[in-house]
Amino acid sequence: KDGDVLIGTTECDTLDTLLLFTSKGNYASIPVWQIDEGKWKDVGMHLNKVVRIDGEDKIKNAILIKSFDTYAWIVTVSSAGQIKKTPVNNWQVDRNNKVMTAMNLGKDAEMINAFIAYSNQQILMVSKDGYSYRFAIEDIPATGVKSKGVKAMNLGKGDSLAWGCVMNAEDPAVLYMTNVGQMKRIHTEEIVFGNRPMKGNLICKRLKTNPSIVTLAKAVSAGEELIFKDPERQVLRASEVPLKPRESGFGSPLVLKDGWNLYRGIDECRIIDIPTDVDNEVHEDVERLSLFDEKEG
């Protein structure tokens, strides 16, 4: 429909489960067999046919689950600067007629991203003012579905969290984008790696007038295709995005109109055996964890 945004497409089986994450910190669990079959370019079935959801609550991410019995986490990030990881098996539900809490958000906060993460991966954080850093996924304690998580980043006065996502240490570069569609790539080794939470380093030159507002980050390989809609579909190879040092500004390899959107796709959770020597329990004492994090860094 006009004004709607495509989250992603993927192949699936009727025995799979689709988890949908929303801006208000909720999630819906939909068995694929409950989704109506349709033809190519059909508008499709509205979520309200199977799940009650507020019309103002917008879907941000989709994750396809083949099996909840896997050694992986779903990580959620809020605009209030919190981050949470919860084992995939905690997201399985018996009833799915309404949305459920995916993250306990504070007043005026939104959930800005939800994604799958695996052992030994890294989490990348970036603030709107352009500070960024990486840390190990193990730095986030596993907590329950309804917790608010822990502090993701130390922020300067007037700054706020823009984005958080997963990456691998061997990823060659990270793409950063601003609210007006400007972009740059930075070698991964230039992005500081440390313990959560920290402020990080600037990944762009700060201008006194019309400073850049960072809104998005993504690990990329040179041959990867980036698909944008503004509302026309535009495709750009990651290699066409300027590869610049941290101290430089952003480039404009593509002219994007207001309201542009980067196609994210649907995450498919891999099935990984849970190690027998690993404690995969969640911690519910989130307030104590959060207070402890405030003293770090």
Locations of regions flagged by a protein language model:
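Short, structured "edge-of-domain" segments at secondary-structure transitions
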Residues: 1-297
